[in-house]
């Protein structure tokens, strides 16, 4: 009898310790979520303070992965490895909202893209489009098409890339998502430039610049300025090129902003 009681007490203590640890992790993730929009670098440091995220339960680990992806969208650090995002998707596919399922699939596709597994990334993006389309998640449809465009760009299939960027731009425009609309236009212009259609590229980028003037996101405006500067340089219009490239250097980071703005 005493032995049974001792086992029960030990079990309660162990469970209590686990619950306490989980509660601390939940509170920390709440703080990370609040900090992302205000100070994403601080949010990243907070998230990294969880030393062994793989020991979290599936629900909390999935949330940890989602927040890591959102931080990546802000500070352009490396996306999580596929095995972690696969585990996160396993949980969201059963328990998450359609929005969460599509978002985690986008991160998973980007991770496979980073690994160079383009076929797997395309399969995942196709799944994301199916869920987003059924639930009329227009912004997420736009993001997914943008990343599909990146896949085609990586394969030097520029016409196919442009088609996807154009579809993305239409969805962003429809949703009044100014930042992502400007980024999609930037990418259309970039592809035309790669195809030596410099005048058309410039036309698209001037539109992107006028769209970006409506945003307070300096990373977006810097990326448009950088693209314009490069186009003018390719046209040997060096005064204009210098003007836009200097504007980009003075305001932006070293990496271009992502579509999820």
Protein language model annotation of sequence segments:
Residues 7-14:
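Bacterial N-terminal signal peptides
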Residues 18-261:
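A "functional boundary" signal
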Residues 1-4:
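Positively charged n-region of N-terminal signal peptides that target proteins for export
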């Amino acid at each position: 009898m005493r032995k049974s009681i001792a086992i029960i007490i030990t079990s309660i203590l162990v469970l209590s310790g686990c619950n306490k640890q989980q509660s601390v992790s939940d509170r920390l993730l709440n703080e990370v979520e609040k900090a992302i929009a205000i100070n994403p670098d601080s949010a990243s440091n907070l998230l990294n303070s969880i030393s062994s995220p793989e020991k979290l339960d599936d629900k909390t680990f999935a949330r940890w992965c989602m927040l890591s992806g959102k931080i990546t969208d802000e500070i352009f650090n490396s996306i999580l490895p596929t095995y972690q995002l696969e585990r996160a998707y396993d949980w969201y596919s059963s328990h998450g909202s359609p929005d969460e399922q599509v978002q985690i699939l986008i991160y998973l596709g980007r991770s496979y893209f980073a690994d160079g597994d383009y076929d797997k990334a395309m399969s995942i993006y196709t799944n994301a489009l199916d869920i987003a389309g059924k639930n009329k998640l227009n912004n997420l449809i736009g993001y997914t098409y943008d990343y599909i465009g990146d896949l085609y760009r990586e394969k030097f299939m520029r016409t196919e890339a442009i088609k996807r960027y154009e579809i993305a731009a239409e969805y962003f425009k429809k949703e009044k998502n100014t930042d992502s609309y400007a980024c999609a236009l930037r990418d259309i212009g970039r592809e035309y430039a790669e195809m030596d259609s410099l005048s058309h590229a410039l036309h698209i980028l001037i539109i992107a610049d006028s769209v970006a003037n409506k945003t307070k996101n300096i990373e977006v405006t810097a990326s448009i300025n950088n693209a314009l500067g490069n186009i003018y340089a390719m046209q040997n219009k060096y005064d204009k090129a210098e003007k836009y490239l200097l504007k980009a250097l003075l305001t932006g980071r070293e990496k271009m902003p992502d579509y999820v703005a």
